[in-house]
Amino acid sequence: MKNASRIFKGPLIWILLCIGLIIVFLQFAGSGNGYKDIPTSEAVSIINSSKKLDSVTLTDGDQVIKITENENKKYRSYWVGNQSDQLVDRLNDRVKAKTLKSWQGENPGQSIWKALLINFLPFVIILLFFLWAMNAAQGMGGRGGVMGFGKSKAKVGSKDTPKSTFADVAGCQEAIDELQEIREFLAEPAKFQRVGAKIPKGVLLYGPPGTGKTLLARAVAGEAGVPFFSISGSDFVEMFVGVGASRVRDLFEQAKEAAPAIIFIDEIDAVGRHRGAGMGGGHDEREQTLNQLLVEMDGFDVHGGVILIAATNRPDVLDPALLRPGRFDRQIAVEAPDLDGRLKILKVHAHGKPMADDVDLASIARRTPGMTGADLANVLNEAALLTARANLPVIGNSELDEAIDRVIAGPQKKTRLMNQHERLVTAYHEGGHALVAAAMPGTDPVQKITILPRGRALGYTMVMPDSDKYSQTRSELLDSMAYMMGGRAAEELIFHDPSTGASNDIEKATKVARALVTQYGLSARVGTVQLGSGDTEPFLGMTAGQQRDYSDETAKIIDDEVRELLENAHQEAFDCLDANREVLDELVRQLFARETLSKAEVADIFKPLKRWPERGAFTGSDKRVPSSIPPVKPPQIAGVDEDAPEVGAPRRGVIAPPTPEPGGDLPGDNPGEWEPPSDWQPPSVGGGKSPEPPSPTHPGEGPQPPSNGNPWGPPRS
């Protein structure tokens, strides 16, 4: 409907309508006066007959024959070729025979109006078209007009624009506080000028995708009470040279005229990347645009009252001149929300969605660590879609569980049929991941195991921490590598012929091992040094611009260390599965019976599990001996019970995001009936053989340590 009204408002439709009316008028003007059109042959027959005729008129030029038999019978036709000579002779004969009163020939020529119309109509049409094009260029210069490619494409917020407020934003309170202060700057500038404070010229919002950067900007637009100009970074660069800089100038001119005002540039990294990179040189179009942006923000001629808010996912590629104080005075990180933030986000998005009485949003928040606001909104939307698909009145826990699985791993492949052997291999593969994760002390809890195909996986083991973790220890990294290799080790142990299903596990484990050696300085042989430059060329991709800053000999040492770490993790996983073969078989039997096992069901199966001990101390050198003095006790926090039992979730960092992957420890459950000594070492790294569990009738009479004081080999390292 809007497109139709836009078409009828334009002049083009009226021009075409006028031309059509003129053609119709000329058509009807040339006909009429009561004459009936007849074929040429019939007209010639009438003239050659002996009927009495009142008059005949031959009009040259148009070659028209008009025959009047009487007042009620008038005919019109046309002659062709040289018929006129024959017609004239016949008409003269009829006049002599007195069967025709008279005839006349006419050669009137064209009328002056018709001649003018035919000669000048094409020029009139061309002139009207150019007038329309120029009018469109002036009226739509900023919206893609012919002459308006240098105009800004910014959208200006109006009263009719749907508004978001800070009440619609949750999970990033620090960013909200900073942006609310920007709103106060614009509303009450005297309050800040009284103490000598200056209004910030720019605010940069950066963080992972889906954390709410654009939503924060919309909230500022909804509450600022000043004109709000929004534009994407990619809108500045077009096919014409200089368009980007022209649009920057036009954008700031519009904002200055409407000051105080706010400009929001989304994805500013499209124009704000490092200058001098890539193949464009100093005359690259993006560089001209960036230079103009730098001048407008803090150049020679700057007027106050305009605040620039920008958002990006990659602050590392932005030009340093853009980030300095005086341009982007504030740089606000918008990270993935913590537990409390996720709960608030779920409450915001649950508004208007009917929930069952037993739905606990706090439980959903605990089960979704690492998810962004967009992920959580997608979870609730998927749950609502599943509820509507099943024609249910309210959203229940089962729909929310399925929604979480769909967001993490994709929809279930109900039509994919696997034979029993493939299902058995998948069950042992996922069971190997889960068992090794539960046996290692530094892994995350196993939340769910399934052998139902979902997404691109034949099955998956969901491993997530019970609380938010922001770092990882060396022991946790090594344990995570062991559970990543658990699936491959299980296939080798059981089927003696591993499959290709562990390719993604090997990829993840290799990344962890290489980061452990080259980034984190956690290899005793390489030392505490970062190898490999992390700087990248903005126009050459993520890693194409990286340079190796170490020798070939060091590269060989790195490769050897990575291989050794992977081999140790692989062997630890194999030994762990071998020592817990009965538990692994029971887990597979339960997977075949139920197809999906929850956290509580897995904990029940793993009660007799033989768990691996903690790793020994690591300092990277024999010269650095760790202290035996324990750390100080942190101060008491009001409202926190220091003596309350801790939730058994080990620390977890950014290495393994909350995606379906193998592994996990089970917090809060009782240990198995047998555990090796705390300093026991698996045979894979030089330790002794797995000791037998003590006899239940004679507790404490298990195998005794050797007399040399080294009970079961060197501690885990």
UniProtKB/Swiss-Prot annotation:
Enzyme class name: hydrolase
Cofactors required: Zn(2+)
GO biological process, one term: protein catabolic process
PROSITE patterns (UniProt xref): AAA
Membrane-spanning parts: 10-30, 112-132
Main localisation: membrane
Region: Disordered, residue numbers: 617-717
Binding site for Zn(2+): 429, 433, 505
Entry membrane topology: Multi-pass membrane protein
Cytoplasmic side: 1-9, 133-717
Pro residues bias locations: 691-717
CDD domains, per database record: RecA-like_FtsH
EC numbers on record: 3.4.24.-
Catalytic center residues: 430
Amino-acid positions noted as binding ATP in the UniProt annotation, renumbered to this chain: 207-214
InterPro entries attached to this UniProt entry: AAA+_ATPase (IPR003593), AAA_lid_3 (IPR041569), ATPase_AAA_core (IPR003959), ATPase_AAA_CS (IPR003960), FtsH (IPR005936), P-loop_NTPase (IPR027417), Pept_M41_FtsH_extracell (IPR011546), Peptidase_M41 (IPR000642)
Cofactor binding summary note: Binds 1 zinc ion per subunit.
Extracellular topology ranges: 31-111
Keyword Transferase: no
One Gene Ontology term of the molecular function aspect: ATP hydrolysis activity
Subunit structure: Homohexamer.
Family under the similarity heading: In the central section; belongs to the AAA ATPase family. In the C-terminal section; belongs to the peptidase M41 family.
Function field: Acts as a processive, ATP-dependent zinc metallopeptidase for both cytoplasmic and membrane proteins. Plays a role in the quality control of integral membrane proteins.
Protein name: ATP-dependent zinc metalloprotease FtsH
Lineage: Bacteria, Bacillati, Actinomycetota, Actinomycetes, Propionibacteriales
Gene it is expressed from: ftsH
